[in-house]
Amino acid sequence: MSGHSKWHNIQKTKGAADAKRSAAFTKIAKEIIVAVKQGGSGDPNNNSRLATVIAKAKAANMPNDNIKRTIDKALGSGNTDNYESVTYEGYGPCGVAVIVEALTDNRQRTAPEIRHYFDKFGKGMGAQGCVSWSFDRKGVIVIDNEEGELDEDTVMMDALDAGAEDMQADGPVFEITTDPDSFNDVVKALEEKGYSFESAEIEMVPQNYIVMTSEDDVRSMTKLLDMLDNNEDVQNVWHNWQQD
């Protein structure tokens, strides 16, 4: 995981502002609905995909009442929300690799919108697999240590004992990586030890990074990420732009 920095390299769907927070909760709620419907259960102990989304929701400070209401809604016979998972891949300025994960009820609406963003601010949308080969799918758990109250060696030992692959200190946070199949078990084990998370989800982690030196390229890349992030169907955006 050398060189991977959650805060510098991953474009997330939640922000500090109330509007961003609300949008993030809406997107997570959509993920919960899909997880319940596809997993056939509202019990995270019997639905690993739901357990993964709940971990993400809790790390994003989504209230438990919201989570429960969304699960109940998904289980209700009157729920007609039908979303499908779609992944788009393309290139930003300077050949930056970009993966877009979306949940949509209308591919004919979503695909042209995503393609337009890539065409206007990047180098175009590519075929499936054109950039995903250069990413690794990993569970990533981030623990805030801004106050310095946590001991790095202790967190490392607890993470490895829980089944994590690695842990590294990244500025004010500890970043723990896991195999995707072990993610839920690691989250549960760390929660039982009293840890809370800044974020916790399955991510696409770049194998290498691209640095931009042109201000025009930086502006275009920033705009591309903003447009993707603000699209209601887009859940996650992963890229290999090495930001300062």
Predicted segments, located by residue:
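Positively charged, low-complexity, intrinsically disordered RNA-binding extensions
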Residues: 140-244
